[in-house]
C-alpha cells in the first residue's frame, strides 16, 4: 500500500471523487491508505467471504462484491477511474487471465496499478498476457523491484506496474 500511495502522489492524477476498484481487496488494507488520502468512492472485490467481512467492518467501501477475478465479473465494464490490484496477482491466488478483466473494468483514460512478483511474472504468464493486451493500455511507470512482504517467508521481489487504459 505504501507503493500505491507513492504512485498516486508522484506519477498519476486521480481526482478525489473518482471511482476506484480495490481488486482482491482482502481485509481492506489498501482502502485504508486510500481513505487516508481522502478517496472515498471505493468498491472492493474479493473471492473470500471471510476477508470481505473484515473489510466491511471498516466502513470504507461503497460496495463489496464476492467474486473471482479469474473470469468476467458481474461488474459493469469501463466504469473505474482507477483499478488497484496488489498482493493478488501471484501463484495460488489470481492468475494472468485476470488481466483481461481488470482492463475491461477500467475506463478509457483510467489507470491500473498492479503489483506482480518478479519470480512469477514470466513463469506464470503475466508478462505474456500484458504483451498480448499491449494495445489496450500505455505503461506509465514500472517500479524498481521491492520486497513486498519483508517479514514473510515468501519475501519475493515485486514490481508495481502502472498502466493507463487507452
Regions found by a protein language model. Give the residues of each.
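Residues lining the SAM
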Residues: 86-87, 115
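A short glycine-rich, Lys/Arg-flanked "PGG" loop and its adjoining helix->strand segment in the class I
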Residues: 97-108
Amino acid at each position: 500500500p505504501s507503493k500505491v500511495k507513492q504512485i498516486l502522489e508522484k506519477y498519476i492524477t486521480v481526482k478525489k471523487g473518482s471511482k476506484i476498484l480495490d481488486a482482491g481487496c482482502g481485509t481492506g488494507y489498501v482502502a485504508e491508505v486510500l481513505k487516508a488520502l481522502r478517496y472515498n468512492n471505493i468498491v472492493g472485490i474479493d473471492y473470500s467471504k471471510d476477508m470481505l467481512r473484515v473489510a466491511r467492518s471498516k466502513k470504507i467501501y461503497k460496495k463489496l462484491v464476492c467474486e473471482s477475478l479469474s473470469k468476467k465479473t458481474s461488474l459493469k465494464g469501463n466504469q473505474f477511474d482507477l483499478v488497484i490490484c496488489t498482493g493478488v496477482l501471484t501463484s495460488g491466488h489470481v492468475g494472468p487471465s485476470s488481466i483481461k478483466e481488470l482492463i475491461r473494468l477500467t475506463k478509457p483514460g483510467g489507470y491500473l496499478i498492479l503489483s506482480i512478483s518478479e519470480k512469477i511474472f514470466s513463469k506464470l504468464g503475466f508478462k505474456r498476457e500484458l504483451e498480448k493486451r499491449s494495445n489496450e493500455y500505455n505503461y506509465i511507470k514500472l517500479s524498481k523491484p521491492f520486497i513486498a512482504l519483508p517479514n514473510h517467508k515468501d519475501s519475493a521481489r515485486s514490481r508495481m506496474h502502472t498502466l493507463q487504459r487507452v
